[in-house]
From Swiss-Prot:
This is (2Z,6E)-farnesyl diphosphate synthase. It catalyses: isopentenyl diphosphate + (2E)-geranyl diphosphate = (2Z,6E)-farnesyl diphosphate + diphosphate. It comes from Mycolicibacterium smegmatis (strain ATCC 700084 / mc(2)155) (Mycobacterium smegmatis). GO terms for molecular function: ditrans,polycis-polyprenyl diphosphate synthase [(2E,6E)-farnesyl diphosphate specific] activity; magnesium ion binding; Z-farnesyl diphosphate synthase activity. Its main location: membrane. Substrate binds at residues 41-45, 86-88, 92, 212, 218-220. Disulfide bonds: none annotated. One of its GO terms (biological process) is polyprenol biosynthetic process. Keywords: Cell membrane, Magnesium, Membrane, Metal-binding, Transferase. Belongs to the UPP synthase family. Z-FPP synthase subfamily. Its EC number is 2.5.1.68. Homodimer. One of its GO terms (cellular component) is plasma membrane.
Amino acid sequence: MDIIPPRLKEPAYRIYEMRLRHELVRSKAQLPRHIAVLCDGNRRWARDAGYDDVSIGYRKGAAKIAEMLRWCQAAGIEMATIYLLSTENLQRDPDELTALIEIITDVVEEICAPYNKWSVRTVGDLELLGDEPARRLREAVESTTTKGANFHVNVAVAYGGRQEIVDAVRSLLSKELANGATAEQLIEAVTVDGISENLYTSGQPDPDLVIRTSGEQRLSGFLLWQSAYSEMWFTEAYWPAFRRVDFLRALRDYTARHRRFGK
């Protein structure tokens, strides 16, 4: 039961948000360097809000992405990976999928805008989206630069965690074959480091914290290799309703954990 009167909710959340920020500052705890987010629950948000057109939920969720990235940047986080479209999502209704891909393309172009000064990389198989969306996404990402960027963004589109590992192994073996490796040398080349160096996220730190909205408590194939020792944080909030208060709670919970990395 909601005990806070509607007219007092916004002021109450602002006070709570301020308190969380002060807690993080006072704790002097180490914040995550890299946050990964599964932006889930757009369709359910739209249906619960009474909309028949689920693309309204996608649009609402898209508007939240740049906002959340600015929260990360303001907190001093160096990198964020956002999961926007899985390979499984490509099986959705064609009309819904067309609208979703257009929305994703628009939001990536927004993220890549010069005024953000962010370095952006896509992870996934853009060819699965069709020629025009793939072209627009490549052009947008290529317009960003790592030079002078103090915040880096990965956008997971047409991404599958299992496929990424398969692609990494294939890439590793192809390079070894090109160098004339024997069968025995190929077997020896398949190592943890060798696979890591051929992932879509090669050269980047693994995520310290993985956030998933919508109440679902699973990775759904997201960064399977990279998230081996990531901390997980789940919230019931649908992505369009995800607030800065929720984000700060995730950071607070992260700083209270002791990361053992399997030791």
